[in-house]
């Protein structure tokens, strides 16, 4: 964690044009209209917004560019888009529709040159490498999974993260598949291993169940930002109260 202000980032997982949320990447339930949700989150002090088209990569569908454009027209906070980005042309199209950053997951792993070329053209500041990991007990290590968690790679997670950084990724969006949607808290050991080994910001994802979990991710896990979906989508906690909890624990946040 750097000395910068900690960021709270709601994530819109999009399927068939709707916001959805599941547990461990399955059992998806409808959580609302993405454009409406984006506007509400901005009003409620979100620092950034993340939009992930969760079926684009696996179904090989084109990114919902029209939806990206509508959300970008609605909000003024930084806006990251991922899902189905496979080429530099895809990166260009998403940025031209109003995204500030792009998030690449499966395609970056399968074609690491995509990170290299995209960062050379558009700058590392707008390239987020999304990494989905699961702890493999038999090998006692975290490993990379692709296609929304459906494809096992066998590659050690931090090894791939280091390569991604070397190729120009400006941030790592780190999701624990073991914790995703469980609301049992972030995987602190995973966060610490990444934040202590990498020089770029780490966005913690997977497991947020309450504001205290987010405080823990920043203070103990040394994450630079926390990303959450279900606890915000269904209204149990607001971003404002999450930030107040952070502030009470001495974390610098934006509250105006």
From Swiss-Prot:
EC number: 4.3.2.10
GO MF term (any one): imidazoleglycerol-phosphate synthase activity
Subcellular location: Cytoplasm
Keyword vocabulary terms for this entry: Amino-acid biosynthesis, Cytoplasm, Histidine biosynthesis, Lyase
Top-level taxon of origin: Bacteria
Reactions catalysed: 5-[(5-phospho-1-deoxy-D-ribulos-1-ylimino)methylamino]-1-(5-phospho-beta-D-ribosyl)imidazole-4-carboxamide + L-glutamine = D-erythro-1-(imidazol-4-yl)glycerol 3-phosphate + 5-amino-1-(5-phospho-beta-D-ribosyl)imidazole-4-carboxamide + L-glutamate + H(+)
One GO term of the biological process aspect: L-histidine biosynthetic process
Protein name: Imidazole glycerol phosphate synthase subunit HisF
Pathway listed: Amino-acid biosynthesis; L-histidine biosynthesis; L-histidine from 5-phospho-alpha-D-ribose 1-diphosphate: step 5/9
Similarity section: Belongs to the HisA/HisF family.
InterPro entries (alphabetical): Aldolase_TIM, His_biosynth, HisF, IGPS_HisA/HisF, RibuloseP-bd_barrel
Assembly and binders: Heterodimer of HisH and HisF.
Gene behind the chain: hisF
Cross-referenced HAMAP family: HisF
UniProt xrefs under Gene3D superfamilies: Aldolase class I (3.20.20.70)
Species annotation: Leptospira borgpetersenii serovar Hardjo-bovis (strain JB197)
CDD domains reported in the protein's UniProt record: HisF
């Amino acid at each position: 964690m750097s000395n910068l202000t900690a960021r709270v980032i709601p994530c819109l997982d999009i399927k068939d044009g709707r916001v959805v949320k599941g547990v461990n990447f399955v059992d998806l339930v409808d959580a609302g209209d993405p454009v409406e949700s984006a506007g509400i989150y901005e009003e409620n002090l979100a620092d950034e917004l993340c939009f992930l088209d969760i079926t684009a990569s696996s179904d090989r569908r084109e990114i919902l560019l029209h939806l990206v454009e509508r959300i970008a027209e609605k909000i003024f906070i930084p806006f990251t888009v991922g899902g189905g980005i496979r080429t530099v042309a895809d990166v260009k199209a998403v940025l031209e529709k109003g995204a500030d950053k792009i998030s690449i997951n499966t395609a970056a792993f399968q074609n690491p040159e995509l990170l290299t070329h995209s960062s050379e053209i558009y700058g590392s500041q707008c390239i987020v490498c999304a990494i989905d990991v699961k702890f493999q007990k038999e090998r006692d290590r975290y490993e990379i999974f692709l296609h929304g968690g459906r494809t096992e790679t066998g590659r050690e997670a931090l090894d791939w993260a280091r390569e991604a950084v070397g190729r120009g990724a400006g941030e790592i969006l780190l999701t624990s598949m073991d914790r995703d949607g469980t609301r049992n808290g972030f995987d602190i050991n995973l966060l610490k291993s990444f934040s202590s080994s990498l020089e770029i910001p780490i966005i913690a994802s997977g497991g947020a169940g309450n504001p205290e979990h987010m405080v823990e991710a920043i203070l103990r896990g040394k994450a630079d930002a926390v990303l959450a979906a279900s606890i915000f989508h269904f209204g149990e906690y607001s971003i404002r109260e999450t930030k107040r909890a952070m502030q009470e624990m001495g974390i610098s946040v934006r509250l105006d």
